Amino acid sequence: MMLTIIMLSKIFMSSLISMILTIYLNNIFNSPSMLLIYLISYSIYMSLMMFTMCSMNSLLILMILIVFLSGMLIMFSYFISLINEPLKLKMKPFIQTLFLIIITMKIYNKLSQNEHYFNYFKNIDLMYLYMKMNSTLFFIMILMLIITLILMTKITYIEKKTLRKKK
């Protein structure tokens, strides 16, 4: 069971690296919906990695995943209110992404065979922040999500939206 979880985390790690590379290589910032898909996959990846590191705090990991995904949904509704153009998926960036996924999986497989690099995942400071999180930080995150949701609804009801493209 643990071996399959480690293999899944390797796949998620390589896909995360390839997603980050595609953001910078293919100018994904032009499409906010693609950027949102990357952010959602990152939050799912973070919660899976935290579960593999410390499976005893599964309730805390679930709460963090819910906070991340609700934040992503708030951002998604904000972006949807600003987008006039539909998402146009081109085949060339998809093939490049697939190629980068294959390359990063091969590189990650070679690096993970050496146990020196395997200890790197135990020392990630960001993981320590989320695993040993206190309740005030968690409530601040929830409060920020509520404030963002209120501001997003205020922005969508503005009549003269300056952020939209003019026809």
UniProtKB/Swiss-Prot annotation:
Please state the Enzyme Commission number of this protein: 7.1.1.2
A Gene Ontology molecular function term of the record: NADH dehydrogenase (ubiquinone) activity
- A GO CC term assigned to this protein in UniProt: mitochondrial membrane
Q: Which UniProt keywords apply?
A: Electron transport, Membrane, Mitochondrion, NAD, Respiratory chain, Translocase, Transmembrane, Transmembrane helix, Transport, Ubiquinone
**Reactions listed under catalytic activity:** a ubiquinone + NADH + 5 H(+)(in) = a ubiquinol + NAD(+) + 4 H(+)(out)
Q: Where in the cell is it found?
A: Mitochondrion membrane
- Show the stretches that span the lipid bilayer: 5-25, 34-54, 60-80, 138-158
> What's the protein's topology in the membrane?
Multi-pass membrane protein
Q: Does the keyword Lipid biosynthesis apply?
A: no
Its predominant location is mitochondrion
Family classification: Belongs to the complex I subunit 6 family.
Biological function: Core subunit of the mitochondrial membrane respiratory chain NADH dehydrogenase (Complex I) that is believed to belong to the minimal assembly required for catalysis. Complex I functions in the transfer of electrons from NADH to the respiratory chain. The immediate electron acceptor for the enzyme is believed to be ubiquinone.
Q: What protein am I looking at?
A: NADH-ubiquinone oxidoreductase chain 6
